[in-house]
Every structure is written in C-alpha cells, then in structure tokens.
Amino acid sequence: MTDKIKVGLIFGGNSSEYEVSIMSAHNIYEEIDTNKFDVYPMWITNDGYLADDADSRKVLDNPKMEVANPHKVANISNIIELKDRPEIDVFFPIVHGNLGEDGCLQGLFRVLDKPFVGDDVLAAAVTMDKEMTKILAQRAGVPVAKWIAVKRFEYNDPDNEKLDYEYVASQLGSDLFVKPSNQGSSVGVSHVTNEKEYKVALAEAFKYDDKVLVEETVHGTEVETAVLGNDKPIVAGVGQIINAKDSFYTYENKYDDDSTSTLEIPAKLPEGIVETVRKNALKVFQATECSGLARIDSMLRSEDNEVVLTEVNALPGFTNISMYPKLFEEIGIPYTDLITKLIDYAMERYDHKKTLLHKHD
C-alpha cells in the first residue's frame, strides 16, 4: 500500500491547443514530486476518447501519436473507475481551450466530488470569455482596450453595422484586432487595417466561436505576471515579451521553442509600472473569482505607459517556454514546488467547500 496522493493528469482534448496540452502534461509528469504523488496520465484524444494508461504515458513523449481503439468515455463513472487505474484523489487538468478551461471539465469534477487544480466552474467560464473578463476588470478599475462584440446572429445579418469596417473604425480606430471571444493562445486572431482584411478576419474568427471581439490596437509591449493561491494569492514578478518579428504574439511565438520572440524575466521596467501590473493582476484575479492559478496578460501602452489588460489565462501553459512557471521560478518557487503548491491549493479549496451548507435543516 502507498500513502501517496493519486493525481489524475488530464490532457489533450478536442481543442486547437491539443498539442500544447500534451507538451504541458509532459513537463508536469516529469517534474512532479514522486515522493508525494503517484501520477496517472489520462489522455483525451483529439476525437474525444479517453485512452488507456499505457497509451496515455506513451503520448507524453510523442504528441502526434494516434491510437486505433482508445477506451471511450461511456459515462461519468469511467473517469474514476477505469480498469487500469486506481481511484483518483485529485485531478490536475491541463486541457487547454474548449471544454478544458471553460467550466465544463470543472463541472464534471464537481459532480464527481473530487478536488481539482485550477479555477472552479464560474471563474473558468468567465475567464474563458474575453468580453466577460473585460466587463469585470472594468468594474474593478482596471483599464481594458475598447471593444465591440459581434454575436453570430449579428454576423449573419448583412445589414448589421458591426460588419461595416468604416463604422467600427469610427468607434475604435482604424487599427484593429479581431479575435474569438472564447479562444486562447492567439488562435483565430487577426490584425486588420482595412475593409478587406476586416471581412476575412471576421470569417476566420467565427470558425472558432459564436462571439467575436473587435478591439482597438494598443501599441506597446506585452507584459505578463502570474498569480498563485486561493484567498491569499501570491503575485509573481513581471515578465516582458520581446517579439523580434515586430508583430503580435502569435500561437507559434508562444509555443515554438525556436520562436524569435524572447521572454525577459524580470522585465526591465520602472518599479512603478511593475507594481501597477502586479496590483492590476490581483484585482482581476479576485474580480473574476479565480483560484489556484492564473496568468494575467497586459499591454504597456507606449504613448502614455498605461497598463491595459488584454487577457486572463486561468489555465496557463507549462511548456518549455511558458511564462507562468518561469515567473515563479524567478521569485524562488521552482517547477516541482509550484506543482505541489497547486495540488495543495486544490485540496484546500475542496476541504473548504465541504464546510459549506447546501441545504437548510
């Protein structure tokens, strides 16, 4: 018998960030403290199947691997009663994108009555939706880029003024970003400056979501910080992204080891700006009711040095070049200890939830 905590490391999934998820899971699997935890990888294939234990371990070293006959998740109980795995004590989801970080998987864990790393259901759903994040950040006094949201029914109406580049430019300026509201890692994002580009960008973004944001372009430098904890979160230092391509931080820039973008940690910025980035991050983390972890991304606007929120990533990557673990390593929390803390915070929140009343006696 072992008294180690059994961790279900869930990764993969039917998402545009599928391979990123596998790379993150590989790193967590390699770095987790095996004196404290027994790890059981759980690979959800691109087709939505849950592979067995052997294949789930193999794919960690080969993200492009496919299986012919994976074990299908036929019902909820299969998650915790698979024949080749013991019952899991705590889940560590690293399924990026749709279903994995939008509250769906988190809701399943709540139904299973199991602790899990990362946001609870509400915060996961809110932070996945860029518009909802903006609304809550504004209420907390954190600056955000001006935006217009275009819903699917509006996009399908050829007479809707939001489809007119000239109208949108009159509200937000001619230099714009078009992005799916519920996607991460710059997937489906386009930079546009004219009518033709705008039409193409809308079509591209609507491939990924039923709501698209059109935002003013904030010229400056992308800065990021990381948050760890529940009621008394720790805010790391600030990192800065230097993009040699002189363009926005693309999906490839974020996850390609050969990317020409570099991460500067700590950022060489005035102390006042660093503290503003950190204070804003804490405000947003609490306003969106995050718990466990989040990476807060902002732009340092060049014209006035205002820190403008761009995104809350409540399930950040753990790849070789991911900013989240690097920021905590810089302040003295190494990768292995960070993983342990995340699991501890998951257990802490679960234990607290158990003290809440759910019915009136």
Curated annotation (Swiss-Prot):
Matching InterPro entries: ATP-grasp, ATP_grasp_subdomain_1, D-Ala_lig_Van_CS, D_ala_D_ala, Dala_Dala_lig_C, Dala_Dala_lig_N, PreATP-grasp_dom_sf
Catalyses which reaction(s): 2 D-alanine + ATP = D-alanyl-D-alanine + ADP + phosphate + H(+)
The protein's required cofactors: Mg(2+); Mn(2+)
GO MF term list: ATP binding; D-alanine-D-alanine ligase activity; metal ion binding
Protein's cellular compartments: Cytoplasm
Swiss-Prot/TrEMBL keywords: ATP-binding, Cell shape, Cell wall biogenesis/degradation, Cytoplasm, Ligase, Magnesium, Manganese, Metal-binding, Nucleotide-binding, Peptidoglycan synthesis
Pathway assigned to this chain's UniProt record: Cell wall biogenesis; peptidoglycan biosynthesis
UniProt-listed Pfam families: Dala_Dala_lig_C, Dala_Dala_lig_N
Designated name of the protein: D-alanine--D-alanine ligase
Species, as recorded: Lactobacillus johnsonii (strain CNCM I-12250 / La1 / NCC 533)
